[in-house]
């Protein structure tokens, strides 16, 4: 099935036609001057959804996510704390990886640290100077001349003639009102940088933030990428500058598809550390919410729409996951009779799966996919309540254990995309299921001694049996 993605560069949905196999995917990672907030994780979960959908559709993916461990903010933090850059950043790096695991975000294939690629960055800057697209300013910093790159502004759709063009800027972050030549190598300032610098042919200093991503992506993925993803904040100046640098170095198109997620809001305002209205994942875990609940909240809205964060939204996510958990537990009930997978159940599953996938291939429309999931759950619950399969006029077959297992297999399949379904137990080995069936048979003929023996045998294999009013359940110890 064809996948269509909204390309920021063209401002259109385009059929995804990768140039590379595996697909080369680069995503903007954290700047490790502090703990990542959940606004950041909205972007990372969007990128995780993108990757999961690609894998689900059969693509191989090589994924690189950078770690920015040298920039204005990390230097300021290390200077304030009076420690090395590495010592300052390391706790935030460890916390970031722990957060990824808590939120069930798949690991990237590589996590390059900017500080590990300084020699390659220096070499690239020298190449840009030799080409005449970069120059050394009066402050001894090296700048990229945007006037030497004719396509500058294409990604962010800037009309350069209508914008005020300053001479140059050495800050890592700035807005469109300060359009200017941007820094490639920031000259060393002892009052600002302390003892943190690298030697180069241009003098002591450190690389600019924009150059870092260009060099790390080119070093690990080559000169032309299939997809570059990040937050909408990164379109200008960061990604615009990446294009200018990278294409000046390679003389090839840098990225085929640019994807950007929109802001997470708090009280209808953008969540950001500068505004002081942010929450870290740890804040929410301390309030009693789970990683799955946070993931579901951040996952459920379309990535190109703003998502408003509220406590009510988190509680709604909790209820949605409870509904999913109750449904899964119901299917895992082993008391259903043995029978075939009824055609009506198989048809309902296939219809749901087709709707689920079709929505995802339409620019990752997860909202529509989740709506289809809950509609499917409603239909199956209704049929179980009636002790039948999916009813037709000619067939009212009893809902079977095989029906339940078929649906559970389908849910495990779609969880390859969602990464959030709360399965209450792992797959039960066939030999344990056989012992469970033998025990049920012994109980039916009131052979309690044999039933107890089989219970002990099941326990010895790491599973427990719970007998209740609604039937018997098997759980892993």
From Swiss-Prot:
Domain of life: Bacteria
Signal peptide start-end: none
Catalytic activity of the protein: tRNA(Cys) + L-cysteine + ATP = L-cysteinyl-tRNA(Cys) + AMP + diphosphate
E.C. numbers: 6.1.1.16
Cofactor binding note from Swiss-Prot or TrEMBL: Binds 1 zinc ion per subunit.
Residues holding Zn(2+): 28, 213, 238, 242
Binding site for ATP: 273
Molecular function GO labels: ATP binding; cysteine-tRNA ligase activity; zinc ion binding
Keywords: Aminoacyl-tRNA synthetase, ATP-binding, Cytoplasm, Ligase, Metal-binding, Nucleotide-binding, Protein biosynthesis, Zinc
GO biological process: cysteinyl-tRNA aminoacylation
Cited Pfam families: CysS_C, DALR_2, tRNA-synt_1e
Main localization category: cytoplasm
InterPro entries from the UniProt entry: Cys-tRNA-ligase (IPR015803), Cys-tRNA-synt_Ia_DALR (IPR015273), Cys-tRNA/MSH_ligase (IPR024909), CysS_C (IPR056411), Rossmann-like_a/b/a_fold (IPR014729), tRNA-synt_1_cat_dom (IPR032678), tRNAsynth_Ia_anticodon-bd (IPR009080)
Binding partners and assembly: Monomer.
NCBIfam families per UniProt: cysS (TIGR00435)
Name this polypeptide is given: Cysteine--tRNA ligase
UniProt organism field: Chlamydia trachomatis serovar A (strain ATCC VR-571B / DSM 19440 / HAR-13)
Gene: cysS
């Amino acid at each position: 099935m064809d996948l269509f993605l909204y390309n920021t560069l063209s401002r259109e949905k385009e059929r995804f036609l990768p140039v590379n196999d595996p697909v080369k995917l680069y995503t903007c990672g954290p700047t490790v001057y502090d703990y990542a907030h959940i606004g950041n994780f909205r972007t990372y979960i969007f990128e995780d959804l993108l990757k999961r959908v690609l894998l689900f559709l059969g693509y191989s993916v090589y994924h690189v996510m950078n770690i920015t461990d040298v920039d204005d903010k990390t230097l300021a933090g290390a200077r304030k704390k009076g420690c090395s850059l590495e010592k300052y950043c390391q706790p935030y790096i460890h916390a970031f990886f722990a957060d990824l695991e808590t939120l069930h975000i798949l690991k990237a294939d590589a996590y390059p640290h900017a500080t590990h690629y300084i020699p390659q960055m220096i070499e690239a800057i020298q190449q840009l100077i030799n080409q005449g697209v970069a120059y050394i300013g009066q402050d001894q910093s090296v700048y990229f001349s945007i006037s030497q790159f004719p396509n500058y502004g294409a990604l962010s759709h800037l009309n350069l003639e209508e914008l005020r063009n300053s001479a140059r800027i050495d800050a890592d972050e700035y807005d469109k009102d300060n359009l200017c030549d941007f820094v490639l190598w920031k000259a060393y300032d002892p009052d600002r940088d302390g003892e943190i610098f690298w030697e180069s042919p241009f003098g002591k200093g450190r690389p600019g933030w924009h150059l870092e991503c260009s060099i790390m992506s080119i070093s690990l993925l080559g000169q032309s990428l299939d997809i570059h993803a990040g937050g909408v904040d990164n379109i200008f100046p960061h990604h615009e500058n990446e294009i200018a640098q990278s294409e000046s170095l390679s003389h090839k198109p840098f990225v085929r598809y640019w994807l950007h997620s929109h802001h997470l809001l708090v009280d209808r305002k953008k969540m950001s550390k500068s505004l002081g209205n942010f929450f870290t994942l740890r804040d929410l875990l301390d309030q009693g919410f789970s990683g799955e609940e946070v993931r579901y909240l951040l996952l459920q809205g379309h990535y190109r729409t703003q998502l408003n964060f509220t406590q009510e939204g988190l509680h709604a996510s909790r209820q949605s996951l409870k509904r999913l958990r109750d449904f899964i537990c119901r299917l895992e009930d082993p008391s259903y009779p043995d029978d075939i997978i009824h055609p009506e159940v198989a048809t309902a599953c296939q219809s749901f799966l087709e709707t689920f996938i079709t929505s995802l291939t339409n620019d990752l429309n997860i909202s529509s996919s989740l709506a289809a999931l809950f509609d499917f759950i409603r239909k199956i619950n209704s049929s179980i309540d009636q002790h039948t399969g999916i009813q037709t006029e000619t067939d009212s077959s009893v809902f079977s254990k095989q029906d339940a297992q078929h649906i559970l297999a389908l849910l495990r399949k779609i969880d390859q995309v969602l990464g959030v379904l709360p399965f209450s137990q792992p797959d039960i080995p066939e030999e344990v299921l056989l012992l469970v069936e033998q025990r049920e048979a012994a109980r039916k003929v009131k052979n309690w001694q044999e039933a107890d023996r089989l219970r002990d045998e099941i326990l010895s294999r790491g599973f427990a049996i719970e007998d209740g009013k609604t039937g018997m359940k098997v759980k892993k110890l």
